[in-house]
């Protein structure tokens, strides 16, 4: 449906024009006639009906947003949500990109249906993982090839033109006010498309584990009551990823305790709430690489948990 239809006069003749976007110069359908007048009337009627539906939906959204706040459900800052909505519109979220790091714990809380004692702390940066072509990519699962029009960096620039790729950290984009967006990528996903400005490190073997299992998809409300989609890694693999990071020698010391707490909490959540969708069974154990097996065994020993067949 065009964004607008209007009459324009040329050489004493009225022509019906349409615009497919706000940046469109407009294209003529033809001179005024019974047919073009009918087209304009149908467009005007349809547009009016859609506006009425949108107003009705807005009222429902405001009502649900109020309920969401009263229930004190987890929410995202609006800045991050704006990025997520745009990535979703451009068919990048879930197909090419997963949300990782602390921001992912908002999704885990909603998916589990319980307040997690750690993990969902506010953060001033935004971490994404490249997943195109992996088994967790929605496009791979559905056998689709989305018609992408923008890259991750292109999406960021469309939201805030001040974003620049950091000269010191080519995997990071920074806005003029210091907001950071980082792109991480598993070695198996390299090289990235040539038109993507981000250049993530190719040596992060731990990113491979976030491309396993079954990703989680939720819709979360923002602080202002708007909606945003979240697609995050399998909570079991994220848990062990976090426990591995806590033992990684190069990891910043001030992050290690948080990593360990987040990992343990996610495994507990999977144990008690996600038996049907993300079971900690023998099949899962057999998938674990050597680097993660001892971490899972340690958690089992501490928790008194025995995987079922």
Map each language-model feature to its residues:
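Compositionally biased terminal segments of proteins
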Residues: 1-14, 21-309
């Amino acid at each position: 449906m065009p964004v607008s239809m209007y009459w324009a006069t040329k050489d004493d003749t009225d022509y019906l024009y349409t615009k497919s976007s706000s940046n469109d110069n407009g294209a003529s359908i033809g001179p005024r006639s019974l047919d073009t007048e009918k087209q304009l009337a149908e467009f005007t009627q349809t547009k009016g009906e859609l506006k009425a539906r949108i107003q009705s939906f807005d009222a429902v959204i405001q009502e649900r947003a109020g309920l969401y706040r009263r229930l004190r459900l987890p929410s995202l800052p609006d800045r991050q949500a704006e990025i997520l909505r745009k990535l979703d519109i451009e068919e990048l979220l879930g197909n090419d990109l997963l949300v990782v790091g602390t921001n992912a714990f908002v999704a885990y809380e909603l998916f589990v249906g319980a307040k997690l004692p750690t993990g969902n702390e506010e953060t001033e940066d935004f971490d994404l993982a490249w997943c195109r072509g992996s088994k967790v990519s929605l496009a791979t699962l559905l056998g689709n090839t989305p018609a992408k029009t923008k890259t991750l960096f292109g999406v960021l620039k469309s939201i805030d033109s001040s974003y620049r790729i950091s000269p010191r950290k080519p995997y990071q984009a920074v806005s003029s006010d210091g907001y950071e967006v980082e792109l991480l990528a598993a070695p198996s996903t390299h090289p990235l498309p040539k038109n993507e400005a981000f250049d993530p490190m190719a040596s992060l073997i731990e990113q491979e584990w976030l491309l396993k299992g079954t990703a989680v998809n939720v819709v979360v409300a923002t602080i202002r009551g708007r909606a945003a989609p979240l697609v995050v890694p399998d909570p079991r693999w994220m848990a062990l990823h976090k426990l591995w990071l806590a033992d990684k020698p190069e990891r910043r010391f001030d992050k290690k305790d948080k990593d360990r707490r987040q990992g343990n909490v996610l495994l507990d959540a999977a144990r008690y709430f996600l038996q049907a969708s993300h079971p900690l069974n023998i099949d899962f154990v057999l998938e674990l690489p050597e680097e993660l097996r001892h971490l899972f065994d340690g958690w089992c020993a501490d928790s008194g948990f025995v995987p079922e067949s």
